[in-house]
């Protein structure tokens, strides 16, 4: 499924709300939460993670993974939590606006 601009950032922030994860786990969590509807390409995920890090919304630290491998683990910052709240509000507004367009007006007949 294709993403609207900025949607991936919101999904990453939301996923990290529940705790720190490495990139592969972030992609898996989004895929699992969406019941396999959203498959995040790593070519999109890692630039998004870098962008979020540069904005100060997440921080990254190299750690040892559960499989005893080095992995960059990402954590949500307080600024990231605030940004997530803003993004969730914008998303809700967007969904309501699309729903209004998609719902026929009273008396409107589709061709």
Q: Could you tell me what each predicted segment is?
A:
Residues 67-88:
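Basic, amphipathic "hinge/linker" alpha-helix immediately C-terminal to the N-terminal HTH DNA-binding motif
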Residues 56:
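Glycine-centered, phosphate/nucleic-acid-interacting loop/turn motifs that mediate DNA/RNA or nucleotide
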Residues 1-46:
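N-terminal helix-turn-helix DNA-binding core of bacterial DNA-binding proteins
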Residues 49:
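DNA major-groove recognition helix of helix-turn-helix
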Residues 63-64:
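Short, solvent-exposed loop/turn elements at beta->coil junctions and helix N-caps
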Residues 81-111:
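Amphipathic alpha-helical dimerization/coiled-coil segments
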Residues 60:
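Short beta-strand "wing" residues that participate in macromolecule-binding interfaces
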């Amino acid at each position: 499924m294709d993403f609207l601009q900025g949607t991936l950032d919101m999904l990453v922030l939301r996923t990290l709300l529940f705790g720190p994860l490495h990139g592969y786990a972030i992609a898996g969590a989004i895929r699992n939460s969406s019941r396999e509807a959203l498959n995040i390409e790593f070519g999109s995920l890692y630039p998004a993670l870098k962008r979020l890090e540069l904005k100060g919304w997440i921080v990254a630290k190299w750690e040892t993974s559960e499989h005893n491998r080095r992995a960059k683990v990402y954590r949500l910052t307080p600024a990231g939590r605030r940004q997530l709240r803003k993004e969730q509000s914008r998303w809700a507004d967007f969904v309501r606006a699309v729903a209004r367009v998609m719902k026929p007006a009273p008396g409107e007949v589709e061709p």
